[in-house]
Design a protein with these regions (language model features):
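Conserved beta-strand scaffold positions in the cores of enzyme catalytic domains, especially
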Residues: 26, 73, 96-98, 154-156, ...
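Catalytic core of membrane glycerolipid acyltransferases/transacylases, capturing the structured
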Residues: 38-102
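Helix-to-loop junction immediately C-terminal to a conserved catalytic motif
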Residues: 15-50
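Well-ordered alpha-helical segments embedded in enzymatic catalytic cores
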Residues: 28, 58, 107-111
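Short hydrophobic helices that act as membrane-entry/anchoring signals
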Residues: 3-22, 91
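Non-catalytic C-terminal accessory region of glycerolipid acyltransferases
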Residues: 5, 106-268
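Short, flexible loop segments at the rims of nucleotide/cofactor-binding pockets, characterized by
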Residues: 17-25, 50, 98-102, 133, ...
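Short, basic, glycine/proline-bearing loop/turn elements
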Residues: 17, 92-99, 126-129
């Protein structure tokens, strides 16, 4: 009964709210087509960057079939579950699972592993919390750890634009445009430990972020040349860091204009 109610809520109010506020454009679904056909893979770990509380309903609506019907979102316990009514709504509408932003308890980890073992998929924000300044944060190893322990693949995801809609410190949301880019699934390799696999996940999300700024081929060329923009931004702080973010967004605006101008050649 709860799943039936959740389907109605996601298809109706949740999707309506996301479309109204974010007008999302979802890309990269084709990169998951082979994974969807594999009968030896059950639960999947989706690992997006995190800029806004809007990210949680956004991911609930953006994750494609066959995973969206059995999807749990690891959500901040101190925000989504700070009040009983809010927690009930989050659990029912978003299938949100309360998790501590800073440290994942043994109990939470075991429960997530059990869900993955039962072919449920999980959304985990590796940064552990929302961006405080528009740049990303270093990834924590929760997604990598769960993947290594369960064998579940990690799908890197880059979300672009939610920080401008309802970023940290904003009192109320405002409308904007959002892109959600799914990357190719990552499996832990034989010699991977949690640290190395976590670095691969962060690198994959960084590449998707550069793809969002430019385009697929430009981002790969920049990565090969070692010129990808770091997800965490420059190491310095203060106005220089904010200025770099401004320049970073100018690059993204230029990339968007290039994509809009691109047309298929006339072969007639």
């Amino acid at each position: 009964a709860a799943r039936a109610v959740r389907r109605i809520l996601v298809a109706g109010p949740v999707t309506g709210m996301v479309k109204f506020l974010a007008r999302p454009k979802v890309e990269g679904i084709d990169r998951l087509s082979d994974l969807a056909k594999r009968t030896d893979v059950g639960g999947v770990i989706f690992a997006p960057n995190h800029h806004s509380h809007i990210d949680t309903p956004l991911m609930t609506t953006a994750v494609p079939s066959p995973w969206n019907d059995r999807l749990v979102v690891a959500a901040a316990a101190d925000y989504f579950f700070d009040k009983r009514t809010k927690g009930t709504i989050a659990a029912l509408a978003l299938n949100a699972f309360p998790i501590d932003r800073e440290t994942t308890s043994r109990k939470s980890s075991d429960e997530l592993r059990a869900l993955l073992a039962r072919d449920w998929s999980v959304v985990i924000y590796p940064e552990g919390g929302r961006s405080p300044d528009g740049w990303g944060q270093d990834f924590k190893a929760g997604a990598a750890y769960l993947s290594i322990k369960t064998g579940s693949p990690v799908v890197p995801v880059f979300i672009d634009g939610t920080g401008s809609i309802f970023g940290k410190g904003m009192k109320r949301p405002r409308r904007g445009h959002v892109r959600v880019i799914f990357g190719a699934p990552l499996f832990p390799e034989e010699n991977d430990n949690t640290r190395r696999f976590n670095e691969r996940i962060e690198k994959a999300v960084t590449l998707l972020g550069d793809e969002s700024l430019t385009d697929f081929w430009t981002s790969r060329q920049r990565a090969a040349a070692g010129r990808s923009t770091a997800l965490t931004g420059p190491e310095y702080s203060g106005w220089r860091r904010q200025w770099s973010l401004y320049e970073h967004r100018k690059l993204g605006a230029a990339g968007q204009r290039r994509r809009q101008k691109r047309r298929w050649p006339n072969l007639g």
